[in-house]
Amino acid sequence: MEKRAAAGPEGAPGARAPLAVVCLVNLFLTGRLSSAVPALAACSGKLEQHTERRGVIYSPAWPLNYPPGTNCSWYIQGDRGDMITISFRNFDVEESHQCSLDWLLLGPAAPPRQEAFRLCGSAIPPAFISARDHVWIFFHSDASSSGQAQGFRLSYIRGKLGQASCQTDEFRCDNGKCLPGPWQCNMVDECGDGSDEGNCSAPASEPPGSLCPGGTFPCSGARSTRCLPVERRCDGTQDCGDGSDEAGCPDLACGRRLGSFYGSFASPDLFGAARGPSDLHCTWLVDTQDPRRVLLQLELRLGYDDYVQVYEGLGERGDRLLQTLSYRSNHRPVSLEAAQGRLTVAYHARARSAGHGFNATYQVKGYCLPWEQPCGSSSEGDDGSTGEQGCFSEPQRCDGWWHCASGRDEQGCPACPPDQYPCEGGSGLCYAPADRCNNQKSCPDGADEKNCFSCQPGTFHCGTNLCIFETWRCDGQEDCQDGSDEHGCLAAVPRKVITAALIGSLVCGLLLVIALGCAFKLYSLRTQEYRAFETQMTRLEAEFVRREAPPSYGQLIAQGLIPPVEDFPVYSASQASVLQNLRTAMRRQMRRHASRRGPSRRRLGRLWNRLFHRPRAPRGQIPLLTAARTSQTVLGDGLLQAAPGPVPDPPVPNTDTGSPREAGDGPPSGSGHAPEVGPSVPPPPLNLRDPEYRPEDKERKACVDPLEDSPAPVDTPPEPCLAQDPHPQTPTASGIQDPHSAEPLGVCRSPPPTCSPILEASDDEALLVC
């Protein structure tokens, strides 16, 4: 049933906005709209508004039994001056005292101002005619309801009185009201003046059974208005004058073997009262003696715990079970087929069940019962077969439900044009053949999408004779009631998973772009802030802190800049050879390093330091930059130290010549005072020297170019360090240490050497080696 949600008669437009949002979100995530609609039905706590000229309204779960504890509301809105007419097609609401449990309300106002027009029971109410342009409809089922009532189905039409003409499928009353054609001569006054029932050419052959109250049935005599209890139906006694209460009664025996090519049977409690204190188990064996398929049709009225099992072949075998039917299939026809003309029907009912069993008919497929018409276009053959397998009875003619695959039982109906089919429920609406089984409802009750034998292109045929979109097949969600749209599917990722992954990747990509943008923005702000406070002094300071570290002691020895001392002894020529190899490898590495460095690499290093090593010095501080100048060379405990700064005053030379010492053997001289020379233990002689080392080459090797094998030329020959030389620039080899001096033993002060410094083309600093 097509439903439209709204907040009220005046608030309908406002209610469509949330519906549109829900539908768009559902379409984006699942690729469909249908799953969002049921949540907005009339029984979900929201009002359902109808503004169509004609329509059909059903109780919840129709044609199944309505559930207990349900509240539904509908609102029919017409134009100004319209008159609304409501006619009931079916009505079965559980009866109670003064309709206090389950009820249906109709009127022009909402509760509590609702007029007391409350309905319940099984008798079809008379037509409801509203002189106003709107009608409220409320349905309520109590939580204690048994759930065994089917509900209701009603049709409505709105329009003005005094109309000169009506549509082709409508009937015009004497007061000018237009009604659907099927409403004429139905023994219900919908015109209000009786004109729709006064000009009937022939009275109905039997009054509608709904004129009798619930739990009764009418006699079929033309003039009879007698209603009898259902217990007196098919009880072996004629209670109606014409014997109609015993006509066409099925076999009520509890189980039997049936051998005809067609027949009928029913459960023993079909027309009986409430079941006794014992359970009921019955089995029927059907053998048509025909190799062709047998067709079984059932009408169920089962209780909550009752069920019917149908098996293929003779005998109850689990591997041949066709279907198990329960109370959920009540009030709708059920058709099953079995191969080779054999089947078994088993009925199981609980004690004191409120159900009334079932009624069944069977026939060989391709044959029609005497009171049925064939679905095939050809006439019946000599053997009773038809061109198309299938049959329909006269009550099934033009009822809106396709009983034939070709739709022959719905063709040529008086309420529709020749090329159209009627909707179910006698609403007078019709639809074209192209609208049949395309998964788009054209009838308010969706009759054009029910019992589909074939589907339109682009749709998939479910095992329950429903059609869905082809794109819904194998999408990971069961859209057919039996799940046949997900059978035989390859292992594929569901569409919703793909959609979720796509959305997740888009969100992650967006977050990544935002993060990168923030990072570049922060870098830009930091660069601008750094440049705003950048001065010439800060740039010089940055250049100063990037100076390379001096070489280590091992590198100096390997380069031949200093001789090995006691803590790095050389005992043999093999060790000297290894040391020479280390020197050669270090020279090659330094040449390779000097050839690779260039301006581009220096600029890259500066950029890297600016990005990740921002100077930490306080802003405005001027770095003290002095030229690197070696004023003294200290040869102490195996370390080469360069003490920058001005050359201090020379110490007082040692006048003690009684025990001459070599330079560096005694304590250094003081600051002008000659300390007493006492007995002291001389340091161990430098015995572990390079075998090729000579004292006269000491000063010459101090100015060796690390990149060349030959010593660098000097301008002036080195002068020996004599303690007796009074010249302040002369090196002193005194072994006496001045107590006010912080210099270690063996200090040789000398003027700045004239040897050329080691320079690299790409470095800003120069390595001065003495």
Swiss-Prot record:
Residues 689-703 have a biased composition (Basic and acidic residues). One of its GO terms (biological process) is endocytosis. It is found in: Membrane; Membrane, Coated pit. Its main location: membrane. Disulfide bonds join C43-C72, C99-C120, C166-C178, C173-C191, C185-C200, C212-C227, C219-C240, C234-C249, C254-C282, C416-C430, C423-C443, C437-C452, C455-C467, C462-C480, C474-C489. Keywords: Coated pit, Disulfide bond, Endocytosis, Glycoprotein, Membrane, Receptor, Repeat, Signal, Transmembrane, Transmembrane helix. Residues 37-496 are extracellular. Binds GGA1 and GGA2. PANTHER family: LOW-DENSITY LIPOPROTEIN RECEPTOR-RELATED (PTHR24270). This is Low-density lipoprotein receptor-related protein 3. The gene is Lrp3.
